[in-house]
Amino acid sequence: MIQTYHYSNILPRLNKHFLGFYLDDRLVGVVTLGWGTRPLHTIKKIFPSLETKDYYEIGRMCMTEDMPKNSESQMLSQTIRWIKKNCPEVKILFTWADGMVGKPGYVYQGSNFYYLGYIWTDMYMKNGIKLHPRQTKQFFAEDKEDKRLTCRPTFEQQQEVGIQHYRGKQFKYLFFTCGKREKKRLMKECTEPLSRDYPKDADLEWKMQVGKGKWELCSRPPYSTDMNSEIDSGIGLEKAAEKDTAAKENITGNVA
């Protein structure tokens, strides 16, 4: 279902639970719980006393668009209830809203999550397909004279093969799943401002690299989907972009 309805079509690497939500016998929503690429660093930066075991991060969340309004908020509410019942040791539900693809996090705002601000994140893209920096190396001949430690392509390399480099905002949210006493303690400890002064569409911004070290504000990047094993193994970027566009014309989905 995630491959069909989630814009990214791939899963994070660290997944602990997969929750399915049904209307009668039909699967209409999915939430995955786990951690991002740096689990301990993520939580320590916000709550220094907490460990990886003390929180879950929403990896993917998607629901069919034929569901009634506010269904995503109901799904989130059920997710929180499930965590409290089945994972009482978990104190925090953490998540990101991907402003890069135009999402300031309205579903989290509607579910009364706390907002913690935003970061700027990078996206490399070719023909509408998002690439991890490591995935860009397949387009370049090996350069033994390149002594840089990073796997990120230079601006000249990007220009050579038609890769665009964008920057956009990612918005941080969390919900306390612990008891009132622990919540009070954690709110005092929190190193980032907790608020419900939420971002809106007007707060979305994007930048495109136009030269070495030079960036200009731009419109929303023409993102189609993420590079996955199917694309990487032979379908090709052009055909993958066409396939994803056709699928989205036939199947409508929604994501937080």
Predicted features by range, described:
Residues G34-I163, K172-F175:
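Acyl-donor binding region in acyl/amide transferases
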Residues S8-I10:
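Helix-loop element at the rim of GNAT/NAT acetyltransferase active sites that forms part
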Residues L186-A256:
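Short, cationic low-complexity segments
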Residues P12-N15, W206-M208:
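A short, aromatic/hydrophobic, helix- or strand-capping loop or linear motif
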Residues I2, N15-W35:
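Conserved beta-hairpin
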